[in-house]
C-alpha cells in the first residue's frame, strides 16, 4: 500500500470512528438522569394508572436501573401535559402517557398543538368503555336509559372522566346518535378522571357516567357501581353479565388506547431506545400479569405503525366531529 493510500485509509477509519462514537456513547450512557413520565391526567385516573403500572413493569422486568419520575398534569383535558412537552423540545428525558385526546383536542379547538408537535413512540394498551350507574339505580338496562333520553335528552346528565372531546364523550354520542337520540340536547359534565365520575355517581350528583372500566374496577366489583353496557366487540371476562353495544341493538365498538409520546424533535437515539425498551416490556410476564389484573388489552404498536394509525384515526375523528357539529 502506498504512503498516500495508507494515510487516506487511516483518515477514513479515524473519521468513521469519530462519527460513530457519539451514537455509541450516547446510547451506552443513556439515560444519565431520571426520565420523567408525564401522565396527562390527575392521580387516580386511567393515565396516572398507566404511568404507574409502566414504572412497575419496568422495575419488575429489570428494564431500568432507576424508576421513572411520574409527573401528573391533568388539567385542560391533557392539553397542559402536551403544552409542557412542547417546552421540552428535543429533550430525551421527558415522555408522556396520553390517549386519543391528542387527536381530538385540536379538532375541538382547545389546543393549537397537533400530532406534529409530538413524537409518537409506542401504543401500549386498549380498553373499553362502560355506561355505569349506582348499584341501586332504577336503571337496569341501557335500553331504559335510551328510552328516557329520547323523551328528554337533558333528563340524564352524563359524567365523563375528562374534558371533551374524548373517548368517554364519544361513548355517549355515538350510540345515542345511533339510537335516534337528539345528541345536541345531551347534557355531558366533565370531571377530572373516571375515579371522580364514580365518586359523583355514588354521591347522587349525577345519575350515570361513561368512562373506562379500569378506573372503576374496585367499585364495580364491590357492587357499589353497576355497568349497563360495554363498548367491546364481545363480552368481557370481568363483566360476563354486561352486554355489548351490539348485543343491545347498536352497531358500536369503541376502544380507548393509551400510548407513549416523546418531545418534539426527540433524538432518534432516544426514540430507538424507548421503542426497544417498551417492546421488551410488552413481552414481559410482569406486564402481562399487570394487564390481566387491570383488565387491559395489550395493543402494542411500534412508532411507525403507531403514527400511521394515529393519522388514520385523525381523519375518522374529523369526519365524526364534523357530522356532530363539533369542529372548531
Regions found by a protein language model. Name each.
Residues 32-34, 268-328:
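An extracytoplasmic/periplasmic, membrane-proximal ligand-sensing/linker region
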Residues 60, 64-65, 84-94, 106-196, ...:
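Hinge/capping helix and adjacent helix->loop/strand transition within the periplasmic-binding protein
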Residues 10-22:
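Bacterial N-terminal signal peptides
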Residues 2-12:
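Bacterial N-terminal signal peptides that target proteins for export
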Residues 88-97, 152-156, 202-211, 224-227, ...:
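Alpha-to-beta junction loops
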Residues 26-117, 164, 181-208, 300-301, ...:
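N-terminal (or domain-start) structured segment
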Residues 140, 215-283, 294, 312-315:
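C-terminal lobe and pocket-closing loops
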Residues 100-110, 173-180, 207-241:
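A ligand-binding cleft/hinge motif common to bilobed small-molecule-binding domains
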